[in-house]
């Protein structure tokens, strides 16, 4: 089995020598992210990816998930790896501090995410979709929605996914037929069919928040 080794030397060179990450983070209001802190994060990230995720890559591919009685079971070791991912603070890296996150710039998290994609892409798909759902809620959600969902999603207690694909359309959102009809109480009635949702079901988190992308019906 090929062992994964995080390219820490290359990452340090890009961050420190090419991008001047210390000045970059300071401009973003995070002058606490010194070169020493960045290196420490990279080193701990490498340990997690090399020691926890990479060993599950081949076994996860060979075993795959199982679907029985409406329940999805991830490959052996995935649920425990996800628990460690959350407990070690990796899930909350870029989450807003107001909702329990660490408030790291995405540029700080990017090297760790690259490690994950190299060590175990299947595992990264689950966490990456949560990142997307958190970003969408943070940008467009009401204060009530943010307060309800973001703390648990940022901590990793809940995961998220994005429901785009329909039976007749993949990533071409112009072809969507799922509809969202405004209701008198301010909510929307959604009708339509979504399929092939990456990360749409798993046994690693307590809850899964599924964001659906519909076509909004205009009120005449």
Predicted regions and their residues:
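Short, conserved phosphate-binding/catalytic loop or strand-edge motifs used
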Residues: 109-110, 128-134
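Short glycine/proline-enriched turns and hinge-like loops at secondary-structure junctions
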Residues: 104-106, 172-174, 201-207
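Flexible loop/turn segments at secondary-structure boundaries
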Residues: 99-103, 132-136, 144-145, 168-172, ...
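Amphipathic, small/basic residue-rich leader segments at the start of a protein or domain
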Residues: 1-124, 148
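A short core secondary-structure module
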Residues: 187, 191-220
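Structural beta-strand/beta-sheet cores of well-ordered domains, especially the beta-sheet scaffolds
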Residues: 11, 123, 133, 156-160, ...
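Internal maturation/activation junctions in enzymes
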Residues: 126-130, 141-183
């Amino acid at each position: 089995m090929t062992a994964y080794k995080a390219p820490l030397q290359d990452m340090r060179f890009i961050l420190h020598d090419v991008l001047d990450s210390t000045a970059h983070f300071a401009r973003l209001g995070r002058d606490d992210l010194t070169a020493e802190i960045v290196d420490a994060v990279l080193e701990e990230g490498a340990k997690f990816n090399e020691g926890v995720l990479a060993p599950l890559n081949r076994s996860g591919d060979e075993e795959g998930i199982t679907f029985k009685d409406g329940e999805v079971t991830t490959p052996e070791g995935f649920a425990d790896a996800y628990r460690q991912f959350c407990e070690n603070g990796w899930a909350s890296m870029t989450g807003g501090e107001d909702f329990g996150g660490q408030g790291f710039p995405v540029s700080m998290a990017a090297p760790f995410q690259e490690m994950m994609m190299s060590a175990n892409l299947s595992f990264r798909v689950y966490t990456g979709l949560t990142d997307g759902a958190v970003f969408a809620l943070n940008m467009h959600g009401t204060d009530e929605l943010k307060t309800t969902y973001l703390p648990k999603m940022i901590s990793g207690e809940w995961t998220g996914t994005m429901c785009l694909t329909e039976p007749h359309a993949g990533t071409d959102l112009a072809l969507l037929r799922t509809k969202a009809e405004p209701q008198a109480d301010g909510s929307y009635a959604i009708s339509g069919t979504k399929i092939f949702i990456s990360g749409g079901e798993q046994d690693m988190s307590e809850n899964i928040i599924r964001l659906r992308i519909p076509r909004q019906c205009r009120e005449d």
